[in-house]
């Protein structure tokens, strides 16, 4: 009897702990396997929770592969209402504003959320002798670089699963698209994978036999709100006819919110009724149809979508982009003390930055149109990832993560060695030395003939304006001389330029008197000329000797004593005469002070001889 005894183990607050665990997993983003897109923003969730809370989602998820992360696009559903519904399904309660309550209830009824709506299907009104829908005609097609899927609106609500192989030799890679409509809202949209180089190639879409019409959905890649348009259903008839919509009636302008889409149908709207039709597409019997330029122009106005491609693996791949993972990790979530008030942060609802114009959806009847797409990841001309749905305005963590990822992707150039180059503020070119020397030689008024004096060491010094200059350097045909004056260890900075014949001032001004004597110079001076004649006496001395010879010839007849006396007087007169009589500019010695000293010394020597 002891073996038959059983113990009852009870977990207190099991339901609360279980729902709290689901909500915590949602807040952290753990094990999420489905994304719900509404108004260009994405809400991540778990298939299990959605299937338990809604027969609509249960039927949808059982028809799609379970090892992939599905993305469901919901038309005619606001992002705020979807967010509140997710909160209600995970927590069991939600706070909704009064003005948003009608949209919330209508969305819950369309999605068949338990606890908010009656899940019993609405009775279908009988149709008047409508022929039963025939089996769909399956047409195999191959997906090229550019794939266009055109479908026309259908009167009855349904959803379709379509699996397409890419035909590139990879057996493991396939593309699955699921189109769901819960009402009879007639719509016409297009799915296209854009590539400019193959814009002319398009694939004929599946065509059903008489009694059925096809539906299509659009996966946009540009961030614009879905345009809502009113559809005009026609009166019902005995048979369902295929309606052809013209370009002018069926084109939806993404920039004009007042555009209405006209479509002609013959079936009555039946909400909450779902008809499943499956079509298998193979890549072996694909047919490519070349369309004329006129047909291409007619279809340019239709909307085109690019399905995302993700790798299919045996096990679910929950790895996300590093930018999204970093953004989810850094997000902060607010939790109250009571579990019923727990809410998750808006970081889970990201906006599609790269999303295009969403398809216009029908608002009548409270219907909802959803699209689920699963694709294979490949390197194409345009790469698509989950980061394209990131809302930079709402989620700061994801934005910072994306910025860090893009910064790491950009390569930093290597740092160069050596001293960094400094920018020169003055970009004007400096004049060259030769140009300066040539400009100095243009001053003819201040120039003088070149006169040199020999030195005791065999060198020469230039005489200019009574000052002596020593040779400094030579540039081309020009020689530069610097003043020889030196006092207290400081040299005079005056320099002159000589072109071998004349001397020109170059730079600087004298701040000293002329030198009284220079022991290094000899009394002989010379000027460079063609004959190279060197004069040992100065012009003043030559004039003095000429005057004395004339006086001696005139007084030869007089006595020697008187002659000597007269010579002495003549010498004095002749010595004073050059000072009184002005001489020509060419005969005047520039160094007058030195000549005076020399004349006095010469007079003293003559007196000693006598």
UniProtKB/Swiss-Prot annotation:
Swiss-Prot/TrEMBL keywords: Apoptosis, Chromatin regulator, Chromosome, Metal-binding, Nucleus, Phosphoprotein, Transcription, Transcription regulation, Zinc, Zinc-finger
Annotated GO biological process: apoptotic process; chromatin organization; germ cell migration; male meiosis chromosome segregation; male meiosis I; meiotic chromosome condensation; oogenesis; regulation of chromatin organization
GO MF annotations, alphabetized: chromatin binding; DNA binding; POZ domain binding; protein homodimerization activity; zinc ion binding
Region (Interaction with su(Hw)): 551-610
One of the Pfam families matching this protein, by short name: BTB
Modified residues (Phosphoserine): 230
Composition skew (Acidic residues), residue ranges: 567-577
Main location: nucleus
InterPro entries for the chain: BTB/POZ_dom, Dros_DevTransReg, SKP1/BTB/POZ_sf, Znf_FLYWCH
Biased amino acid composition, Basic and acidic residues: 312-325, 422-432, 578-595
Compositionally biased residues, Polar residues: 222-238, 386-400
A GO-annotated cellular component: polytene chromosome
Keyword Transmembrane: no
Zinc finger residue ranges, FLYWCH-type: 452-512
Cytoplasm found in the keyword field: no
Record domain BTB: where: 32-98
Subcellular localization(s) per the UniProt record: Nucleus; Chromosome
Residue stretches of biased makeup (Low complexity): 136-156, 401-410
Chain positions covered by the region annotation Disordered: 115-156, 219-259, 311-339, 386-432, 567-595
Signal peptide range: none
Subunit note: Can self-associate. Interacts with Chi. Interacts with Top2. Isoform mod2.2: Component of the gypsy chromatin insulator complex, composed of Cp190, mod(mdg4) and su(Hw). The gypsy chromatin insulator complex interacts with Topors via mod(mdg4) and su(Hw). Isoform mod2.2 interacts with Trl/GAGA and interaction with this protein may bypass the repressive effects of the su(Hw) insulator.
Function, in words: Component of the gypsy chromatin insulator complex which is required for the function of the gypsy chromatin insulator and other endogenous chromatin insulators. Chromatin insulators are regulatory elements which establish independent domains of transcriptional activity within eukaryotic genomes. Insulators have two defining properties; they can block the communication between an enhancer and a promoter when placed between them and can also buffer transgenes from position effect variegation (PEV).
Name used for this protein in its record: Modifier of mdg4
Source species of the chain: Drosophila melanogaster
Gene field: mod(mdg4)
């Amino acid at each position: 009897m002891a073996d038959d005894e059983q113990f009852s183990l009870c977990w207190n607050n099991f339901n609360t702990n279980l729902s709290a665990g689901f909500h915590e997993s949602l807040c952290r983003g753990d094990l999420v396997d489905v994304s719900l897109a509404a108004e260009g923003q994405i809400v991540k969730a778990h298939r299990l929770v959605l299937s338990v809370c809604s027969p609509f989602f249960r039927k949808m998820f059982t028809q799609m592969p379970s090892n992939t992360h599905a993305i469901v696009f919901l038309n005619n559903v606001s992002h705020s209402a979807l967010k509140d519904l997710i909160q209600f399904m995970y927590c069991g309660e939600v706070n909704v504003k009064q003005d948003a309550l009608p949209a919330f209830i209508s969305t819950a009824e369309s999605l068949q959320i338990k606890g908010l709506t009656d899940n019993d299907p609405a009775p279908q009104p009988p149709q008047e002798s409508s022929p039963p829908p025939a089996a769909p005609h399956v047409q195999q097609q191959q997906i090229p670089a550019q794939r266009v899927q055109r479908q026309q609106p259908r009167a009855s609500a349904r959803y379709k699963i379509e699996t397409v192989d890419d035909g590139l030799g990879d057996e493991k890679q396939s593309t699955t698209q699921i189109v769901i409509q819960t009402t009879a809202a007639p719509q016409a949209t297009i799915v296209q994978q854009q590539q400019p180089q193959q814009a002319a190639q398009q694939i004929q879409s599946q065509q059903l036999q008489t009694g059925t019409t096809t539906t299509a959905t659009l996966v946009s890649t540009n961030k614009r709100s879905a345009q809502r348009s009113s559809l005009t259903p026609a009166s019902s008839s005995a048979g369902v006819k295929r309606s052809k919509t013209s370009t002018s009636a069926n084109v939806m302008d993404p920039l004009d919110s007042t555009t209405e889409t006209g479509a002609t149908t013959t079936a009555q709207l039946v909400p909450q009724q779902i008809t499943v039709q499956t079509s298998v597409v193979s890549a072996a019997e694909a047919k490519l149809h070349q369309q004329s330029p006129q047909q291409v122009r007619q279809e340019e106005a239709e909307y085109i979508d690019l399905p995302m491609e993700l790798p299919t693996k045996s096990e679910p791949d929950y790895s996300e982009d590093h930018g999204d993972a970093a953004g989810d990790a850094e997000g902060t979530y607010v939790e109250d003390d009571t579990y019923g008030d727990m809410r998750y942060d808006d970081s889970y609802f990201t906006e599609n930055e790269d999303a295009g114009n969403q398809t216009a959806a029908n608002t009548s009847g409270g219907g909802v149109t959803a699209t689920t797409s699963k694709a294979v990841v490949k390197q194409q001309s345009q790469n698509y990832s989950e980061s394209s749905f990131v809302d930079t305005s709402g989620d700061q963590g994801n934005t910072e993560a994306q910025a860090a990822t893009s910064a790491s992707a950009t390569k930093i150039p290597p740092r160069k060695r050596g001293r960094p180059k400094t920018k020169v503020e003055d970009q004007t070119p400096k004049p060259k030395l030769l140009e300066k020397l040539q400009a100095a030689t243009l001053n003819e008024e201040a120039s003088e003939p070149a006169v040199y004096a020999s030195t005791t060491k065999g060198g020469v010094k230039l005489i200019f304006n009574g000052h002596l200059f020593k040779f400094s350097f030579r540039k081309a045909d020009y020689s530069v001389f610097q003043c020889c004056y030196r006092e207290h260890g400081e040299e005079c900075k005056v320099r002159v330029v000589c072109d071998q014949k004349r001397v020109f001032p170059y730079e600087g001004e004298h701040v000293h008197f002329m030198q009284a004597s220079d022991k290094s110079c000899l009394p002989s001076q010379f000027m460079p000329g063609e004959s190279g004649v060197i004069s040992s006496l100065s012009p003043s001395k030559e004039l003095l000797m000429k005057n004395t010879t004339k006086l001696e010839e005139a007084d030869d007849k007089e006595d020697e004593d008187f002659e000597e006396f007269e010579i002495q007087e003549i010498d004095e007169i002749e010595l004073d005469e050059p000072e009184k009589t002005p001489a020509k500019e060419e005969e005047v010695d520039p160094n007058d002070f030195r000549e005076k000293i020399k004349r006095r010394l010469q007079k003293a020597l003559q007196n000693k001889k006598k």
